[in-house]
UniProtKB/Swiss-Prot annotation:
This is EST/SMG-like protein 2. InterPro entries: PIN_dom (IPR002716), TPR-like_helical_dom_sf (IPR011990). Present with 195 molecules/cell in log phase SD medium. Its main location: cytoplasm. Keywords: Cytoplasm, Nucleus, Peroxisome. Residues 1-10, 18-35, 55-68 have a biased composition (Polar residues). The keyword Endoplasmic reticulum does not apply. It comes from Saccharomyces cerevisiae (strain ATCC 204508 / S288c). The keyword Nucleus applies. GO terms for cellular component: cytoplasm; nucleus; peroxisome; telomerase holoenzyme complex. May be involved in the regulation of gene expression responses of environment-sensing pathways. Residues 1-38, 55-130, 179-268, 610-643 are annotated as: Disordered.
Length: 1195
């Protein structure tokens, strides 16, 4: 009879042999009855409303529709024509007539499922039911493997699924070992020659189970013939193996090693057989449970009422099913098993889509049922089920390879978000859980709009939520809400920020005002309301960056004396402010925006629409598919007709057709459609107020502290680079010039150029104290723009750039799709160099140790300068690069390549263009700011501040960016953000005399601190000098001293007088003093027994023991002269060590012993005797800095 080939919907061609060996590892197939399988219960449920699964305010819940239910249905639709493979119900023999009876019953399925209106295939998101057929097993032949085929026909798609014993061939207890070896052997042959096996599969697909008993007889004959052939082949293989063993017995040592290697395939076969048997037994149970679960869910859905007992029964079945799914997946994907078995397990999981079935059938189905009965069911059922699935999934992902766990990260977030609606009593916990798992998923998944959207609904940081919402509508797999729904979600984000205004964060008021005005710019009526536009502009010009106390973070004169908390707030949120304005400029999902068209947003919207239509057509018969193909062909013909007849169509009609195509997504946007007039017309859809506000915010950040300006300007530079790169790909020269004019006029180039020159000056002033500057400049100087971008994209470490990944505009620079990683936390494979940048707090990007010590500041600064330089070289943006050395300060040593780098600007008169279309563009896009004479004069000395005529070196609080004595508190702890601000430094204009004395003392210690850090400081050597703490210091800091001694960072000595004083203080009436003295005594004794503290007598000699007390018996008045005894001991020890040591060449006196005390009277007495005295703050600060350099813990 003629052969026809029908594609199996669950078959992956490259994995057919593994699927075959999984199903055909049994003896000869036996016919069996085929009971009817019910239709999936999800088609019996009603639609879910968004308000049930969306974190929205109660007032807005009624306006939402079908969000999470769409997620559930979309998850189900991804399983194309789902099929549960058949299993054996019993081991009893079945006769052939039983099979004939079943075939007759297929034409008349159970009325309970056919007559139900809820079971009808009317919804577009329903999944077609495939007809299951007998899986014909074919044993391995001489040149092939065991192939199991399931015959599927699109005409029978609506018929109920059949379950037969022959549909899945399991390994019976009596199966012989030879058949098991055939399975693994066939898999190996398949791996080596997949094309040969695919050819054999195609020839075997021609059988159709639905024809008649003749086909079944043919199948049986074919199976018998294959068995006979296989037995012959096995005999030959056994003979060959025997000969091989005889030869190996006569070989030498090297051949013995080869013999050992030849045994490995046999071992692989045995382990593979064991794995397959285990998975088959699990699969039997899984399919039984799937059938029972679907039947019970269907009965419960069709019934008018529900009993609690029925829900708990379904719960028990479903939880067991989930457990078996998880066991199946972890068994198949166990990383510790042999590689051969892991490959087998991976292919079995992929072919049978076990992971998808776990999610859709094991999780979504019951949640769907629970949603319908949420009003009158026991909430404990929902709670227990969600918790059980959540724990099972979160535990499973730690036991499987990372590339399989990435998908489950997002699904755990989805499950947590669904739990918010189904189990609202734990709203906060599930919301935090959803945010955590979505955050983990976003480390690996990019360009996925639904993920960004779902993250925005649960994210605590409302500014980041606003950015993620913008990314969801401007990425490749874009999320496409209606304008009304988008406005609803934006309003919800603002309301969340407003509700949290009193949570103790004083900066929330700034965020609330920003979100309020950003939301206003996205209103549909905003472009038609000049008054509202003026209100928004006034806010960004006059109020943005000013707190309730009137403190302006963007006042250039105060850039070095900013409040550290205020500084870190804008540092953490600066990148989000930039991304927010960029996403608003590109239209926030408006496809007719010129930037959206440039970055091909309509193309991805059409691809998404076509993908949906293909999914719909896949649920229909093949004729519908052919019809859609014909329609697609007709669309292409229409495109050709339209483009060929443009001469007869007016420009107005052509533009109308162009924008109509964008709205309807009827045809793709071809490059020939992007005429000059079309580009000009798109400017009507550009929110000019939003563009102006973004430029205002950028200019404000450039006037602020350098530390917060860099994280904000870097996304803008990347955005400008992406515009230039994308526009350079346009074929029309006028269109290229169109975008260059927009770039020249829209951005604040005068402020940007001045900022770059000031940044260069600042780097040159710090190059001597920060060697990293020279190293970075040497590395970046020899790279072009493309090489720089490639370098950073392959090893990104800045969180502000990582946040831009996934957007369409960043895809122009480097497309970041979903990546698979080979090992856990190996982020280098996806281009992330510093994975710690991913662990950002909820309050913006992370301000970590590398930011505290300035390392990332220098990396940001050098990257900004060299990217800006190469951007100016590569594209005609109006920036001129001068390489003439210009002297900025007399202290500069122009050994760095930055010493000869200066940025200048073309005059504004050079921007004008005589082309009419471009002239019209100039009347629409205003120049963002005028250009100063200093920046246009190629020979003028650049400005030293963004404020014309100012000098940053004369600003209050200016200092070099390095850790000095003022960066540490009284306990020696580093003060956060102290590198960037002198907020902590006392004011020299104090009227209090004591404060002035302290200020002068601190100023003296600043220079000494920087000298002590140097290894060649002539007065103190940390390997030789002994540090002697007084009793008060031991009482306060005994634990800190113990830590320093254990790390051998310093050498310590102690006067016996101090030790005896501490012993005496153990009898103090003050409990705090008593406890501190006891701790000090214990610490000193421990250090003494470890030879880490040196005891000194009154005479300066080393005592024989720390408990020595002979001198105290002789000097009974020591208690009244403790300070004098300590000073005397230190002075004599210094003299003895000086006389015993070799003379030093340095004219400055070397200090062998240094006294550490915070007692001003004692310090004054010691200084009178020329004893070097330091404070505990100085010593601990010094140790903190030295510990950082040596990677030692000092606290």
């Amino acid at each position: 009879m003629p052969e026809t080939s029908v594609q199996n919907p669950l078959r992956l061609s490259e994995n057919e042999n593994t699927r075959s060996m999984f199903l055909s590892a049994s003896q000869q197939q036996r016919p069996s009855a085929t009971p009817s399988f019910p239709r999936l219960v999800r088609n019996t449920t009603a639609n879910l409303s968004l308000s049930d699964f969306q974190v929205l305010n109660p007032s807005s819940k009624r306006q939402n529709s079908n969000s999470v239910y769409d997620d559930i249905n979309s998850s189900k639709r991804r399983i194309s024509r789902p099929r549960f493979s058949d299993i054996e119900g019993k081991n009893n023999d079945h006769t052939y007539p039983e099979r004939t009876t079943v075939k007759e019953s297929e034409k008349n399925p159970s009325p309970r499922y056919v007559s139900s209106s809820k079971r009808a295939l009317k919804r577009e998101n329903s999944v077609g039911i495939t007809q299951s057929s007998a899986l014909i097993s074919k044993s391995f032949s001489e040149n092939g493997g065991s192939i199991a085929h399931e015959k599927w026909s699109p005409e029978n798609m609506i018929k109920p699924l059949n379950v037969s014993q022959n549909s899945l061939a399991f390994v019976d207890a009596g199966s012989d070992e030879q058949s098991k070896s055939e399975i693994v052997g066939g898999f190996q042959r398949k791996s080596n020659n997949s094309q040969e096996i695919n050819d054999k599969d195609n020839s075997a697909r021609d059988q159709d189970f639905n024809n008649s008993g003749n086909n079944n007889n043919n199948n049986n004959h074919s199976s018998n013939n294959n068995d006979n052939n296989n037995n012959n082949n096995d005999d030959n293989n056994n003979n060959n193996n025997s000969n091989s063993r005889d030869n190996n017995n006569n070989s030498d040592d090297s051949n013995e090693r080869e013999e050992n290697d030849s045994c490995k395939p046999a071992s692989n076969k045995r382990s593979g057989i064991a794995l397959i048997q285990k998975l088959q037994e699990l699969y039997k149970v899984i399919v039984k449970q799937e059938i029972e679960l679907q039947e019970r869910c269907s009965q419960l859905t069709n019934s008018q009422t529900t009993e609690l007992k029925s829900l708990w029964t379904i719960y028990k079945i479903n939880t067991d099913l989930v457990n078996n799914y998880v066991t199946f997946i972890t068994t198949a994907l166990l990383p510790s098993q042999p590689p051969h078995d892991l490959v087998i397990g991976q292919e079995i999981v992929e072919i049978y889509r076990i992971e998808r079935r776990l999610w859709v059938y094991g999780t979504i189905t019951f949640l769907d049922v629970l949603k319908n009965f949420s009003n009158f069911m026991d909430p404990e059922v929902c709670c227990q089920f969600i918790t059980h699935v959540f724990v099972s999934l979160s535990t499973m992902i730690s036991d499987i390879p990372s590339k399989y766990s990435i998908t489950w990260l997002q699904r755990l977030g989805d499950l947590s978000r669904m739990a918010i609606a189904l189990y609202p009593s734990s709203f906060i916990d599930w919301k935090l859980s959803a945010e955590h798992w979505y955050t983990e998923a976003m480390k690996y998944i990019y360009n996925h709009g639904k993920l960004y959207y779902h993250m925005s609904t649960v994210q605590q940081n409302t500014l980041e939520a606003f950015v993620n919402l913008g990314k969801s509508v401007f990425c490749q797999e874009t999320f496409t809400p209606s304008p009304q729904y988008m406005q609803l979600v934006i309003d919800n984000i603002y309301q969340r920020a407003f509700v949290e205004r009193n949570n103790g964060n004083l900066r929330n008021s700034l965020l609330i005002e920003y979100l309020k005005h950003s939301e206003a710019m996205l209103l549909p009526s905003f472009l038609e309301s000049p008054d509202l536009q003026n209100v928004v502009l006034s806010y960004f010009i006059e109020k943005f960056g000013i707190d309730a106390n009137g403190c302006n973070i963007f006042n250039a004169e105060d850039m070095f004396v900013q409040n550290p908390d205020f500084f870190k707030y804008f540092f953490r949120h600066g990148p989000s402010f930039a991304q927010s304005h960029i996403l608003q400029i590109v239209g926030f999902g408006e496809p007719k925006n010129p930037f959206a068209i440039l970055f091909e947003l309509p193309k991805y919207l059409k691809e998404r629409k076509d993908k949906k239509e293909r999914k719909k057509s896949s649920n229909n018969d093949s004729s519908v598919t052919e019809s859609s193909t014909g329609n697609s062909r007709n669309d292409n013909e229409d495109d050709d007709e339209i483009m060929s007849s443009t001469t007869s169509i007016s420009d107005h009609d052509l533009l109308a057709e162009f924008f109509n195509d964008i709205d309807t997504l009827r045809r793709p946007i071809l490059p020939s459609m992007l005429t000059n007039e079309a580009w000009l017309e798109t400017l009507k859809f550009l929110n000019m107020t939003s563009l102006k506000c973004g430029i205002i915010v950028l200019r404000k950040f450039l006037h602020g502290p350098l530390g917060i300006a860099l994280p904000h300007i870097l996304p803008w530079i990347y955005f400008i680079i992406s515009i230039c790169l994308k526009s350079s790909q346009l074929s029309d020269p006028v269109s290229k010039e169109f975008w260059m004019i927009i770039v020249k006029r829209a951005f604040p180039w005068d402020t940007m150029v001045t900022f770059m020159n000031v940044l260069i000056v600042y780097l040159l002033d710090n190059q001597t104290s920060n060697s990293i500057i020279g190293d970075l400049c040497d590395d970046y100087d020899k790279l072009s723009l493309s090489e720089l971008l490639e370098l950073f994209n392959e090893g990104e470490e800045l969180p502000e750039i990582l946040g831009c990944w996934g957007t369409l505009w960043f895809d122009t620079i480097c497309e970041k799709n979903t990546h698979s990683i080979s090992s856990e936390d190996n982020f280098q494979e996806i281009g992330i160099k510093d994975y710690m940048a991913l662990d950002s707090p909820t309050d913006g990007i992370i301000f970590d140790e590398k930011d505290e010590n300035g390392e990332k500041f220098w990396k940001r600064a050098c990257r900004t300068i060299f990217l800006f330089r190469e951007l100016s070289r590569s594209f005609p943006i109006g920036v001129i690069i001068r390489n003439d050395p210009l002297i900025y300060r007399s202290s500069f040593q122009n050994t760095n390549i930055l010493g000869s780098l200066v940025f200048k600007l073309e005059p504004l008169c050079n921007i004008h263009n005589n082309i009419p279309v471009l002239g019209a563009l100039e009347s629409i896009i205003d120049i963002s700011e005028a250009r100063s004479e200093n920046n246009t004069d190629l020979h003028a000395v650049p400005e030293l501040s963004v404020n014309e005529g100012d000098n940053i070196f004369h600003y209050v609080g200016y200092k070099k960016l390095r850790a000095d004595y003022t960066c540490f508190d009284k306990n020696g702890e580093f003060l956060s953000a102290s590198l960037y601000t002198t907020w902590y430094v006392p004011n020299s204009n104090n009227t209090n005399i004591e404060d002035n004395i302290n200020y002068n003392s601190e100023k003296e210690n600043e220079g000494l601190f920087l000298e002590c850090i140097k290894s060649d400081y002539p007065e103190i050597d940390f390997k030789t000098t002994y540090f002697v703490f007084d009793a008060t210091s031991w009482l306060r800091h005994s634990a800190r001293i113990f830590k320093l001694a254990q790390n051998r960072l310093l050498r310590f000595a102690i006067c016996l007088t101090t030790f005896q004083e501490l012993r005496f203080l153990r009898k103090s009436k003050d409990e705090n003093v008593m406890e501190a003295a006891t701790r000090g005594i214990i610490t000193i004794r421990q250090l003494y027994y470890e030879n880490k503290v040196l005891p000194l007598r009154f005479t300066g000699n080393v005592a024989t023991h720390i408990e020595e007390n002979l001198e105290f018996e002789e000097q009974i008045t020591w208690r009244t002269h403790v300070d004098e005894f300590v000073i005397e001991s230190v002075m004599k020890a210094q003299e003895k060590l000086e006389s015993a040591s070799e003379p030093r060449l340095s004219p400055r006196r070397f200090n062998y012993v240094v006294l550490i005390s915070d007692d001003d009277a004692m310090k004054k007495k010691a200084e009178e005797k020329e004893i070097k005295t330091l404070s505990t703050r100085f010593v601990f600060s010094l140790c903190t800095k030295l510990g950082e350099q040596r990677h030692l813990c000092t606290d």
